[in-house]
Amino acid sequence: MKILFDYQIFFLQRYGGISNYFFNLIKEFNKKKIVNKVYAPLYINEYINNLKLDNKFGININLNFFKINYFLNKLFFSLFIKIYKPNIIHLTYYENNNFQKKTKKYILTVYDMIHEEFSLNFKKNKTSINKLNICNRVDHIITISKNTKKKLIEF
């Protein structure tokens, strides 16, 4: 079985709880000899620099050209899926642009429901809409806590 982690959170977070969660998950997979790879062609994350070379693909960049770099990540990721042929794709955030649903299983981790609980503070932010859409498309959802699971079911 081959697991592929996408680029999203590694492109969006230099440091942070979500990227640290994935960094630790990947380290545990390595201990258990579960084949996995992070494909983040262009990333800003510092945790990913500490992964073994055979666990990652990409280069650390600065964010001067955010939109162009994000587009390139999406493009390269969809091509890499065809080359790497993972059994499972674990999405690291809530964009849902890289679906090849018929041939792969998709997993999503939901970290919290902050955007939904405090929606008045996030009026222009599309995270809630993206999260709802992606939750309806993936094969399996992991929640960080029982409380997050309860709130996700309520929304």
Model-derived features with residue positions:
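Carbohydrate transferase catalytic cores enriched for Leloir-type hexosyltransferases
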Residues: M1-F155
